[in-house]
Amino acid sequence: MTVILLRHGVSTSNTARTLAGRAPGVELTERGTEQAAAVADRLAMLPIEHIASSPLLRCQRTVAPLAEKLGLEPDHDERLIEVDYGDWTGRPIAELVTEPLWRIVQGHASGAVFPSGEGLAQVQQRAVAAIRDIERTLAEKAGRDVLWVACAHGDVIKSILADALGLHLDSFQRIAVEPASISVVRYSPHGPSVWKFNDTGADLSALAAAAPTTPTPGGEVPAAANADNGNAGHRDSP
């Protein structure tokens, strides 16, 4: 089973340098809308059979062009929703970096709980559970490997990737997930493997091939050894 983790495109909150959290009405910018269209063009050639998405508007807008091209109805899953940042919601990043909690978020994420909000450990638990549950449901229904998309938010995707990589949550800020980037995780009986990471423009044709059952010796990705692995960006704010 293979999931394409898609972060929403650039939002009005991203450009304003505020922490959107679950605040209503946060739209994509013009650039974010262009990114959503570009992602749809990249992914539409793949045999994607399911789209799950955070219910927040910026994720809905991001997957809409792809869903239209594929003729799929996105499933809005509350477990993929943005972190509940509580009292931090809507505040400028420039203010938040002066808060004592900021250091905990960056270096000891497993112990970070946002005031009147949720903890990052809770976020990882619900997000990973969502991915695994959807994978299981799709596998039982199809009886074979399925390629699907999950559109979510930066910290949510980073927590899923940390789990797939076997990283402790305290290290998840070392993972970069840019707006409209994709990361690809393949789950097998041998465990998860990360095929793409914070990718914003690589060749994805290898994803249309059958999934290998085990990693290839030497670390090469079968049928995609020459594919560009994308560009890692700057470290995300929470």
PLM region descriptions:
Residues 27, 68-129, 186, 196-199, ...:
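Phosphate-handling substructures
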Residues 37-44, 124, 128-139:
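Generic structural signal for well-ordered alpha-helical scaffold segments
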Residues 83-94, 140-146, 163-238:
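Acidic, low-complexity terminal tails and accessory targeting/binding regions
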Residues 2, 6-72:
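Active-site-proximal alpha-helix that buttresses catalytic centers in soluble enzyme cores
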